[in-house]
């Protein structure tokens, strides 16, 4: 398997188009798209500004829309593709202080399920990985008591790692998942049960 890592401001449709075109130029095709850009701007709903809301949705949801739209053009011509969007259990259940993040991640699930229905006949699958509490830079800012409380709420009794999420993404990108589309795979240690 070959991969390339490119950087772009996913809030820009032009940047997303260039990102996809540059990837296609490097490999001659686009087989897998992973929508993984994500930011937070956590505040209680009453304190959240419109800018807080818009910035999170622009990156987390509109960025995935722009990238998916650009990549699907290549995938449709190939009659093959795998789209994997990284959402969150927060997109399924909500979370206090994260209305913008929850809305963006719930929207990402809807976007991906719609793409699954639109492109299944072209041998393009679209699925969601919804991580729970994962040790990342985004969760590293939490206080130790908050981290301990989160860990205690996970039936598996531990916090997940990036490798756990990567394994789910790799599975959905592979041939073994060719008949799986429109699904949400929670990688959360049982947190969402």
Describe each model-derived feature in a short phrase.
Residues 8-19, 50, 163-164:
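The beta1-alpha1 cofactor-binding region of Rossmann-like NAD(H)/NADP(H)-dependent oxidoreductases
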Residues 29, 120, 125, 180-182:
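Short, small/polar-rich loop/turn modules that mediate ligand/substrate recognition or access, typified
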Residues 88:
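Residue(s) in the substrate-gating loop at a strand-loop-helix junction
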Residues 128, 151-176, 180, 187-189:
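C-terminal helical subdomain
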């Amino acid at each position: 398997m070959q991969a390339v890592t490119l950087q772009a401001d996913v809030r820009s449709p032009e940047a997303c188009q260039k990102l996809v075109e540059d990837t296609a130029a490097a490999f001659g095709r686009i087989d897998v798209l992973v929508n993984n850009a994500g930011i937070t701007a956590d505040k209680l709903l009453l304190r959240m500004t419109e800018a807080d809301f818009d910035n999170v949705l622009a990156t987390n949801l509109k960025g995935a829309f722009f990238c998916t739209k650009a990549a699907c053009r290549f995938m449709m011509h190939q009659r093959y593709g795998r789209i994997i969007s990284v959402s969150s259990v927060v997109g399924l259940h909500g979370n206090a202080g994260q209305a913008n993040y929850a809305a963006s991640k719930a929207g990402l699930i809807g976007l991906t399920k719609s793409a699954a229905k639109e492109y299944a006949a072209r041998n393009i699958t679209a699925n969601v990985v919804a991580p729970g509490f994962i040790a990342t830079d985004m969760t590293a800012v939490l206080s130790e008591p908050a981290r301990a409380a989160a860990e205690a709420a996970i039936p598996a009794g531990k916090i997940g790692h990036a490798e756990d999420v990567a394994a789910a993404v790799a599975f959905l990108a592979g041939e073994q998942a060719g008949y799986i589309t429109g699904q949400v795979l929670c990688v959360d240690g049982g947190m969402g049960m």
